[in-house]
Amino acid sequence: MQFIDRCQIKLIAGNGGDGIIAWRREAHYDKGGPAGGSGGKGGNIILVADHNQSTLLSLKYSKIIRASNGDNGKPDLSSGQNGMDKYVKVPIGTTVYDEQTNEVIVDLIRDKQEYIICHGGKGGRGNAAFKSSTLRAPNLYELGDEGEEKTVRLELKYLANVGIVGYPNAGKSTLISKLSNAKPKIANYQFTTLVPILGIVENNDKRLVFADIPGLIENASEGYGLGHDFLRHVERCEVLIHLISMNPLDHDDVIDAYEKIMTELRKYSQLLVNKKMLVVANKMDVEGASENFNKLRSYLAKKGIDISSISAINGDVNNLVDRVFDLYQKTLSTTTETNPFSIPMVAEKVYYYDGEKTIDDDPLDVIKDGENRWIVSSKKLTYWFKKIPQTTLDNITRLGQKIKSLGVEDQLKKMGAKPNDVIVICDYEYLIDE
């Protein structure tokens, strides 16, 4: 299966159904009365974290995902059926960004965790909903609200506790195959690993998830090679293993190789180099490895950094496992987290979607368009002009009350508007009352 860990999609929730005007015609209801039902609510779009998903491939080519609209009201006091919610499954560890603002909307890190990313529109009311003791036969109805619409970016960041980073061919795949049950492709050439490989490592009844990250090269943080695409997967790791080959054929200078990897981590994010890190020398079984190891160990000692040595291909990894688990436990003890997956979770934002209530109180935008003509706009005006169709006298009266309550005429008079001046709102023209 093709590995896709990033994609962009447009999400459109369902529109609310329209309310209708209808009247009771049964023989035993001699006075009739309003019977127009309200529209159904539009369907939501809901993201669901699913442990069966391992890639965003199924969403890569889904440019637009829609939920269904609510049905219109019916003429027998019945409301329209609500639109069906659309559930979108994503891998655990998916972070959702608003494509316009680049803000994190939600981090889905638990199996079956759900989040309503786009709310369906509220259904419009039918005339039966407007009946009152003072309004016995209302010729009022509303259109349904539009569903929320968002363009989002999904990024998968694996939930690994320990990340293995280093140059291509450092022996990362061999190491994770010896540590765990993972079966990565292993060969003696660069970029054998093309996607992150996860493996579960057990030690004294404890277990951690290790991630083999595709090899980094110089300028990986700027998009060269494969590493830049996958560095995000180590953002959640509590511990990093910086694996370096001691084979003289793999590097011109082992110190330079160490520093270049550290530079790429730092350029991508300072948070990566601030993580707990073990520097591990690999391929100690080859000729010339001891000289490289001693050279690097002396260099790191001046920085106060320890280095350990292994030969992953020979399975000499038990001491390394103990060190990793000890360091991980110490890392947990310095945080408030106590569970084995110490993963920071972005607080979920709560969106209340109820038509007008979601609209910020924005000021009226007034433009003088000629001697006696004024163009007025605001989000709330636009909302109510979409909500109240001007097809009945009662609706026109209600819309006029909304315009007045929003202070349109008061604002215009303060700016010098006179009676019989023309007001333009949402392409409709009106005259200012005398």
From Swiss-Prot:
* SUPFAM superfamilies per UniProt: Obg GTP-binding protein C-terminal domain (SSF102741), Obg GTP-binding protein N-terminal domain (SSF82051), P-loop containing nucleoside triphosphate hydrolases (SSF52540)
Please classify the protein's predominant subcellular localization into one broad category: cytoplasm
What EC number(s) does its UniProt record assign? 3.6.5.-
Question: Which Gene3D superfamilies does the protein's record reference?
Answer: GTP-binding protein OBG, C-terminal domain, GTP1/OBG domain, P-loop containing nucleotide triphosphate hydrolases
Q: Does this UniProt record's set of keywords contain Transcription?
A: no
User: What does the UniProt keyword field contain?
Assistant: Cytoplasm, GTP-binding, Hydrolase, Magnesium, Metal-binding, Nucleotide-binding
Chain ranges of the OCT domain: 356-434
Presence of the UniProt keyword Thylakoid in the record? no
Entry-linked PANTHER family:
DEVELOPMENTALLY REGULATED GTP-BINDING PROTEIN-RELATED (PTHR11702), MITOCHONDRIAL RIBOSOME-ASSOCIATED GTPASE 2 (PTHR11702:SF31)
- Give the family this protein belongs to, as stated in its UniProt record: Belongs to the TRAFAC class OBG-HflX-like GTPase superfamily. OBG GTPase family.
Summary of subunit composition and partner proteins: Monomer.
Write the protein's name.
Answer: GTPase Obg
* Organism placement in taxonomy: Bacteria, Bacillati, Mycoplasmatota, Mycoplasmoidales, Mycoplasmoidaceae
